[in-house]
Design a protein with these regions (language model features):
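Short boundary/hinge segments that flank catalytic cores
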Residues: 1-84, 90-96, 101, 150-221
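Structural motif
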Residues: 57, 118-122, 143-145
Length: 221
C-alpha cells in the first residue's frame, strides 16, 4: 500500500513512513530508516504546542504493526538532537485496565513524565482495548501506525474512524510501516545508494508522478 491508496481508503493524511529492509541494498537499510525518521520528525514539529511536555500518542489497531519500532526511532532521533524524550508503553509503564488510566483526563493522571520535553505514549492495540477519549483529546498528536504489507480490514477502518471521533480537535495521522523503498522515496526523496542508474530511475519515476497528477487535475478528479 502506498500513500495515495492509504489516504483514499482511510480518509486521513499519511504523515510519514518507515521502510522495510531491502535485500538488494542491505548495507543502506539503517541509513534509509534514519532518513525516513528525519522526515517524519520534521513533519511532526509544526503540531507541537508551546506547553510542555509535547504528548504524542502512538496507536495501532493490531499487535505487531510497529508502534514500538516507530516510537523508539523517534525517541532516538530527538535524543540525538539534545531533547529530553520520554517513552511510555502499556507493556511496562502503565496498565491500560487500571482505574487511573481509564479515568484519566491527561497523561499526568496516570504516569510520571519527569522533565521530558516530548513524551511518546505507546498504547495497547485498539482492537483489544480502546483508549479513553480524554487522553486522545488532550494530546498534541495522535499517530496511527499501519503496516503497508497488511490488508486494512473493515474492522481496522471502523476502529480508526472511532479514534478520529474521539480525538476531537487533536490531529490524527497515519504512519505507514514496512513500506517499499519507492513508496518511502515519495517522502524522503532518493534513498542511497546514489548511483547514476538509481538517479535516472528516480527522475523517471518522478516524471511519471508529475504526469499522472497533471492528468488528474485536468480531469477534475
Amino acid at each position: 500500500r502506498d500513500r495515495i491508496r492509504a489516504e483514499r481508503i482511510t480518509g486521513r493524511k499519511v504523515l510519514g513512513v518507515m521502510p522495510r529492509n531491502s535485500r538488494r541494498y542491505r548495507p543502506f537499510n539503517q541509513q534509509a530508516k534514519e532518513i525516513a525518521m528525519h522526515c517524519l520528525a520534521k513533519a511532526l514539529v509544526p503540531y507541537f504546542g508551546r506547553e510542555k511536555p509535547v504528548v504524542i500518542n502512538i496507536l495501532s489497531t493490531e499487535e505487531g504493526d510497529g508502534k514500538h519500532f516507530v516510537a523508539q526511532y523517534l525517541r532516538d532521533y530527538w535524543q540525538k538532537s539534545g531533547l529530553k524524550v520520554g517513552l511510555l508503553s502499556y507493556r511496562e509503564e502503565f496498565n491500560c485496565r487500571s482505574e487511573s488510566y481509564l479515568l484519566a483526563n491527561n497523561l499526568t493522571d496516570y504516569c510520571q513524565v519527569g522533565d521530558a520535553m516530548i513524551v511518546l505514549v505507546v498504547h495497547q492495540p485498539l482492537t483489544e482495548e480502546s483508549v479513553p477519549s480524554p487522553l486522545l483529546e488532550s494530546a498534541n498528536l495522535n499517530l496511527m501506525i499501519a503496516r503497508s504489507d497488511r490488508t486494512w480490514t473493515t474492522i481496522d477502518q471502523e476502529v480508526f474512524e472511532k479514534v478520529g471521533e474521539q480525538s476531537g480537535e487533536t490531529p490524527l495521522f497515519l504512519v505507514l510501516n514496512q513500506t517499499a523503498w519507492d513508496v518511502t522515496e515519495d517522502f524522503t526523496g532518493l534513498l542511497p545508494p546514489y548511483s547514476r542508474f538509481r538517479r535516472w530511475l528516480y527522475r523517471l519515476s518522478q516524471l511519471g508522478l508529475t504526469a499522472r497528477d497533471t492528468k488528474k487535475n485536468e480531469s477534475g478528479v
